[in-house]
Amino acid sequence: MTMTDPVADMLTRLRNANSAYHDTVSMPYSKLKARVADILKAEGYIAGWKEEDAEVGKKLTIDLKFGPNRERSIAGVRRISKPGLRVYAKSTNLPHVLGGLGIAILSTSSGLLTDKQAGKKGVGGEVLAYVW
């Protein structure tokens, strides 16, 4: 069975594992998911990720990050642009999540970028998700 929205599946797995205080979460690998994981790592929301060989295909394993008293580093995740309703933002009208405390992940002509990176480069694109 094919998955219609792999990014939403990734974000849901992250949200569920985070709320259950799991240390790692695994999912099927794709280049897009790996780029999203790169952004989450660079912004400090996850501890790291690795690509592993599975019986069929590859899998992406993400190490979740918690504070010293097991506080969650990811407070919330929301998928914005969906297969049935794409959401785009111009470079002059980029979204700001929680007044700049969170990030918006955009798919641009320059690759996947956060809202701040897209603003510096002056590019817009499809708004994939909000993370805070």
Curated annotation (Swiss-Prot):
GO CC term, one of those recorded: ribonucleoprotein complex
Disulphide connectivity of cysteines: none
Keywords: Ribonucleoprotein, Ribosomal protein, RNA-binding, rRNA-binding
Key word Manganese present: no
GO process terms (BP): translation
Molecular function per GO: rRNA binding; structural constituent of ribosome
InterPro entries assigned: Ribosomal_uS8, Ribosomal_uS8_sf
NCBIfam families associated with the record: PRK00136.1 (NF001109)
Function: One of the primary rRNA binding proteins, it binds directly to 16S rRNA central domain where it helps coordinate assembly of the platform of the 30S subunit.
Quaternary organization: Part of the 30S ribosomal subunit. Contacts proteins S5 and S12.
Family note: Belongs to the universal ribosomal protein uS8 family.
Designated name of the protein: Small ribosomal subunit protein uS8
Classification of source organism: Bacteria, Bacillati, Actinomycetota, Actinomycetes, Micrococcales
